[in-house]
């Protein structure tokens, strides 16, 4: 049968207990979103990540430590009359958590798993004319973030991408890993991998995950250092960030890959215990 896009399925089912309309979720799709979040939480905990809930607003100093602020002016929302911005990703909030601190070398790597809403204008080059919930102004994302010793950061990035790949393998979503060229990477990253999911309704691979090693770019701007021994010279940590799962985009991938010819969506096996059913 001809597979539909997630948007087409949502429009067709408007008014039922399951629909996608702009950024509204109803019924079983809300449960599906919660199921993905619950599965991701347990998955990262088993991998040794500490769960963290970051602030959803940061000041300009924190933002400028994590990114080149001018590049994000058309992407993130500023709170009028306040020195505060809504986070475009929890990476920015977590990166600034240890600003002006010296960490103990024996504590590294520190691995954090964060679930948070993210807010983006999706304007200019960052936004495309996408319908439905693939590209929206507000979305939920589970993030991996690591503070690492410099000599270990390449290895940690490999582990992060392996972790994300395993996650999508367990969900049963067809995907591929892409190493980005320097022209396609963000300016703060030294090396970036994307995971792209196959979307049969769109007949295309679409990005659902990105894993970057920022080396000491953020650490130098935020003054985050470490030392292995007392009185030893300090070094800058390396920071790494990666989407484990963008909830709405992963829902689109599930809807397009698990749809049936009778109009149902099979629930990935690892999520069934959270929904209490095998199809929606």
Where is each model-derived feature located?
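Single conserved hydrophobic/aromatic residue that forms the stacking wall/gate
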Residues: 1-15, 20
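TRNA-recognition modules of translation machinery and tRNA-sensing kinases, especially anticodon-binding
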Residues: 16-17, 21-280
